[in-house]
Amino acid sequence: MIQEQTILHVADNSGARSAMCIKVLGGSRRRYAAIGDVIKITIKEAIPRGKVKKGEVLKAVVVRTKKGVRRSDGSVIRFDTNACVVLNNNEQPIGTRIFGPVTRELRTEKFMKIISLAPEVL
């Protein structure tokens, strides 16, 4: 469950290290985002000479949460950190590599690129 002011790790090589959620997109008063939801973020920490800079406001998709995701068979997949992948305005990933596992819930038409770049799909 990601809400406003949540700090997330960035799981790609866009140059951002950490980001803060400033808005959950999709709905007028939507409070929480789960895995696969698009959020608006601001970059809090970035590496030098990266593709993104500190203070930029971008979109991102949530790929890992501590809360996890419940499958239809009753199993729950949880992670140690909250993580996101930075997107451009066309909702395509800015980075060319994804770090760490992602879940099958991202397997929609919009995020197949993230699935194909990820080292492990749970």
Swiss-Prot record:
Source domain of life: Bacteria
Signal sequence residues: none
GO cellular component: cytosolic large ribosomal subunit
GO BP annotations, alphabetical order: translation
TM segment ranges: none
Molecular function GO terms recorded: large ribosomal subunit rRNA binding; structural constituent of ribosome
Gene3D superfamilies: Ribosomal protein L14
Disulfide bonds: none
Keyword line: Ribonucleoprotein, Ribosomal protein, RNA-binding, rRNA-binding
NCBIfam families attached to this UniProt entry: rplN_bact
Similarity field: Belongs to the universal ribosomal protein uL14 family.
Function: Binds to 23S rRNA. Forms part of two intersubunit bridges in the 70S ribosome.
Subunit field text: Part of the 50S ribosomal subunit. Forms a cluster with proteins L3 and L19. In the 70S ribosome, L14 and L19 interact and together make contacts with the 16S rRNA in bridges B5 and B8.
Protein name, UniProt field: Large ribosomal subunit protein uL14
